[in-house]
Amino acid sequence: EFCLGLGPTLFGITKGETKYSIHLLPFGGACMMEGEDGDSSDDRAFTNKPVWARIAVVAAGPLFNFIMAFVFSVILIACIGYDKPVISGVMDGYPAQEAGMQEGDTIVKMNHKNIHFCREINLYLYFHAGETVDVTYERDGKETQVTLTPVYDEESGGYYVGFYENNARTRANVGDSLKYGVYYTKYWVDLTFESVRMLFTGKVGVQDMSGPVGIVKTIGDTYEESKIDGMFYVFINMLNISILLS
């Protein structure tokens, strides 16, 4: 059986020796082969194939998830551009302003980790909340490094270094689309591994992880947040979720 989606089957047809079906939840999918769930006398069955062939089949799934993520990321960047890590402003009295950072500065590194677009800034600060960070920024072709210690805000319950990112999109040519497609794919991989690391180190608990209900809620929240920018952005953000779930 070859199916698209998860959950109850909405529609299915059998053609030749294969059943094709569409399921309720619009993400994920499966390819279930003869002999995968039990013994089969068919020479073509999965369990009757050599070990190297079975390893290749099992490895092909994760490999093509990465390839799919890269292809979708390139399409995403080509269609809507990328967000340069440029500061749009600083907050009065916060570490960024006190360190001399200004509107228009471009963030290059955070604790020696290269930064390519705004989401990487948010990702780093989220997973290192409250930690002192060495920020390298570029202004007029010159790089400067400053050390920022986040300030805790009781009202919001979060830590802030005190600068805003400029989320304006920059048009991408073919080369930029391919290059930032790699960066974007790496971003999602980093996000996934950091989330797992926080789970194992106790920074988040199992109760913070989403099951099917949480995933559906996330999709709903993403739709509400994105629809103001148009249905194309809704589609793109849903695509991002699909990449992560893969």
Predicted regions mapped to residue ranges:
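PDZ-domain C-terminal substructure recognizer with occasional recognition of PDZ-binding tails
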Residues: 102, 108-109, 122-166
